[in-house]
């Protein structure tokens, strides 16, 4: 019986879809014949070297063992056929030609490090996903500079404005913006193949950059030490998701304060914070939001004092910190 994944293209974006293909191929291999895998026709077929015989019209996929809506984000799913996966997931000549026509950044530097910053939808679902903080990227970039002094960083993101604001001051960094006059599929693949062409990687907790790094076969990959939050982290264990040779780095805050079980979103005037323990909602004004972000993010105590004393020369911000503490919105780091 054939092994299928009928939901391909309808359950997550490109990174998730690559895991679904790899996992299904792995299951078919374990069942006796990798060629028994079958998928519905796929928007990204022209960009990868997966043989066309694996794809058929959706209504032709019948009497199969189907993967349902499993994400299959587990190296063990395709450990029996990793060489085949690497071969199938290499870019076609068409993919490379199109990417080069949309991005001018190929082969402009002797050594390049791809930096992928995933923000976008993650900002709205903090219970499941942590947005990698700025210090994760800056510290990882410094590691790469020490190892590869000539490297040039290509930063790709779904939030290029944030990246320009935080990285544009560095002369060895280029923030890559999405190509104009490209379809969504063309844009996704141009960015993916530009990333994949790099020599080293600093990835977010994103399957998109995971596959760019993995399929490049680079030995120089820095990745977050934590991928998901809460219950989701037990469903996709980090130990079976990340290759052993990738260098894991913390994405935990380095500020002097920690947050308890809070959900944080952005309102018109400041942060809206929901305490999941009491379900109480706190609306912070702009100055309280600034202090909350500084104390729980990528800033040392000295950084916080310097910034807040510039904003509030009369030292009045200290009472604001006490208010955050009394409300239980922050607590001292241990």
Feature roles, as predicted:
Residues 10, 14, 148-240:
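Donor-binding and catalytic core of enzymes assembling or modifying cell-surface/extracellular glycoconjugates
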Residues 4, 40-148:
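Secretory-pathway luminal glycosyltransferase catalytic domains
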């Amino acid at each position: 019986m054939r092994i299928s994944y009928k939901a391909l293209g309808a359950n997550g974006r490109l990174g998730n879809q690559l895991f679904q293909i790899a996992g299904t191929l792995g299951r078919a291999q374990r069942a006796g014949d990798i060629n028994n895998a079958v998928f519905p026709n796929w928007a990204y077929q022209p960009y990868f070297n997966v043989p066309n015989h694996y794809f058929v019209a959706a209504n032709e996929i019948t009497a199969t063992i189907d993967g349902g809506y499993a994400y299959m984000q587990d190296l063990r799913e395709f450990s029996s056929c990793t060489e085949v996966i690497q071969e199938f997931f290499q870019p076609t000549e068409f993919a490379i030609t199109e990417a080069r026509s949309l991005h001018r950044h190929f082969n402009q530097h002797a050594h390049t490090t791809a930096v992928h910053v995933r923000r976008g939808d993650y900002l709205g679902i903090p219970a499941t996903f942590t947005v990698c903080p700025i210090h994760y990227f800056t510290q990882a970039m410094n590691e790469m500079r020490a190892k590869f002094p000539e490297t040039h960083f290509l930063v790709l993101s779904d939030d290029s404005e944030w990246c320009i604001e935080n990285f544009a001051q560095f002369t060895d960094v280029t923030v890559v913006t999405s190509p104009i006059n490209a379809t969504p599929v063309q844009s996704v693949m141009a960015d993916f193949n530009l990333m994949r062409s790099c020599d080293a990687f600093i990835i977010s907790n994103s399957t998109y950059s995971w596959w760019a790094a993995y399929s490049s076969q680079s030995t120089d990959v820095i990745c977050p030490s934590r991928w998901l939050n809460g219950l989701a982290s037990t469903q996709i264990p980090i130990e079976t998701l990340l290759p052993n040779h990738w260098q894991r780095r913390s994405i935990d805050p380095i500020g002097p304060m920690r947050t308890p079980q809070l959900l944080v979103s952005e309102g018109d005037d400041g942060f809206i914070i929901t305490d999941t323990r009491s379900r109480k909602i706190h609306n912070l004004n702009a100055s309280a939001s600034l202090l909350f972000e500084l104390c729980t993010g990528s800033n040392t105590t000295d950084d916080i004092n310097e910034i807040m004393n510039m904003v509030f020369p009369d030292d009045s911000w200290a009472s604001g910190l006490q208010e955050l503490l009394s409300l239980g919105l922050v607590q001292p780091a241990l």
